[in-house]
Amino acid sequence: MKKILLVVIVAVIALYAFKRMVVEPYLWKKAINTPEHQLQMGSFIFSQQRGHNGSQSMENQYFIFKVTEIQGDFVRLAVIRKLSAGDQIVQGDFSTTKKAYGELKGNIKSVVITGISRNDLYGRRTGRDPHQIDEYLLQKYPALKTSRYYFEDVPDKTRPVPQDPMDRMEYFSLVYSKKAIIEHGRLVAWILNNRPEPELSNRVETIDLILN
């Protein structure tokens, strides 16, 4: 009986390893070459990640990104969020809810998502919540009346990598490796690790889906 149980356990482990190492990479490479799922400007990337929930425990976190810039191996992503209305906080961080994540996977092509400049979000009056809708944003971005989903838009999508250290730190925020996305279906960030030149992070996040 113990031998049979051991054989079953080994078989399950082998099947799981085969699925992760052979089947999933094959399906990813097949999908990434189709027009609906290939990486390009404007693509939406869905990713489930493990993160801290504010205490010592971990939880699943759900992220939706929009590709706003591609330069060589640098792929800049912007987080899709929903502006809060009134005193109701929709999202306290960059992740979204499991329910919204599932819904947007099915209908994101029909949802109005507005690109808002960084200055309009953060560069105005002090004491204002940058993630809360107000009359200024409604006047400048009328599409927000239809849907409060938005992303932080990049005004200059062809700017070179800056030389100033502080500007470089800001530049490499949410910049990921194009090769890792296409070849492995992974989000691997480019970071400045106390060095003048960027390097790839050791942290790897899995991509669920790319949609165009």
Predicted regions and their residues:
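Mixed-charge, low-complexity intrinsically disordered regions
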Residues: 2-63, 74-212
